[in-house]
UniProtKB/Swiss-Prot annotation:
One of its GO terms (biological process) is tRNA pseudouridine synthesis. PANTHER family: PSEUDOURIDYLATE SYNTHASE (PTHR11142), TRNA PSEUDOURIDINE SYNTHASE-LIKE 1 (PTHR11142:SF0). Belongs to the tRNA pseudouridine synthase TruA family. Substrate binds at residue 119. It catalyses: uridine(38/39/40) in tRNA = pseudouridine(38/39/40) in tRNA. Its EC number is 5.4.99.12. It comes from Nostoc sp. (strain PCC 7120 / SAG 25.82 / UTEX 2576). It holds the Pfam family PseudoU_synth_1. This is tRNA pseudouridine synthase A. GO terms for molecular function: RNA binding; tRNA pseudouridine(38-40) synthase activity. Keywords: Isomerase, tRNA processing.
Length: 282
């Protein structure tokens, strides 16, 4: 704990946060549930001697992972902003890591200053399960998936659209407009990766969308039907969300991002989902 008699200076500190979502009930603090926000706030409180509020760029659901979530808090004390990462890490459990910390201006906000969020969903398509990838993917082996059809279904989503069909109940958001900036679906060995970048995401949007894409890729639903469904906002037909463990928040982008590019996720998925290692293990 910091010495309360030291001169206090207030600074806003931004964090890049990585976490394994398996044993968390999401990002946002909740009573009687373990959450990422609560764990980090508790760690900071032990350092400062009082509670601070941590603001995240996105509220990931229960079981969802993050390679580079971004958050900020206001601190009083003499700890330099760039040292906060290592200080907080010494108080955190092993399934959360602060990758970097930096000073930002008092008007910078992890959520409201963000230009985009990018998510990746991973599907594992081999018949046999693999315990090393199960925590990070949806093991879908019920029917072959055509990733080219899934990519074709994604393309019309580019741009600004009313995506109420992929909006779970329980959200406080007053509208369902989303500007989709990038979409991609590609196969890497036994894995299909779906990436979506947008200015913001509706509650449950990616998992509902992936659930429908799998229906397209498996031939259960046509491309035309999929497009009509979301354009006509037929939410009642979107019944199955993809499992949470396959989803990962990859990055959050800002016009004035205060970190160097090495905090990004780029090498992480290659280590977790290495095609060569899986092939060689057979």
């Amino acid at each position: 704990m910091l010495d309360s008699h030291q001169p206090k200076q207030t600074q806003r500190v931004a964090l890049v946060v990585q976490y394994l979502g398996t044993h968390f009930h999401g990002w946002q603090r909740q009573k009687q549930h373990r959450t990422v926000q609560e764990e980090i706030e508790t760690a900071i409180a032990k350092i400062l001697g009082h509670h601070v509020t941590l603001h995240g760029a996105g509220r990931t659901d229960s079981g969802v992972h993050a390679a580079a979530q971004v958050a900020h808090f206001d601190a009083t004390g003499l700890i330099p902003a760039h040292k906060w990462a290592s200080v907080i890490n010494s108080y955190l459990p092993k399934d959360i890591l602060i990758k970097a910390s930096a000073a930002v201006g008092d008007r910078w906000h992890a959520r409201f200053s963000a230009a985009y969020r990018r998510y990746r969903y991973t599907i594992y398509t081999e018949d046999r399960p693999n315990l090393f990838v199960t925590p990070f993917s949806w093991h879908y082996y019920y029917a072959p998936l055509d990733e080219s059809l899934m990519q074709a279904a994604l393309k019309p989503l580019m741009g600004k659209h009313h995506l109420a069909a992929f909006h779970r109940a329980g959200s406080k958001r007053s509208h369902s407009w989303v500007e989709v900036q990038a979409v991609e679906c590609h196969r890497s060995g036994p894995f299909i990766h779906i990436e979506i970048q947008a200015d913001g995401f509706l509650y449950g949007m990616v998992r509902l969308l992936v659930g429908m894409l799998v229906q397209v890729g498996s031939g259960q639903r046509t491309l035309a039907n999929f497009t009509e469904l979301w354009k006509e906002q037929r939410r009642e037909e979107v019944k199955h969300a993809a499992p949470s463990q396959g989803l990962c928040l990859l990055r959050v982008g800002y016009p004035d991002f205060p970190f160097t590019p090495d905090v990004w996720y780029d090498t992480m998925p290659k280590l977790v989902f290495s095609q060569e290692s899986l092939v060689n293990s057979h």
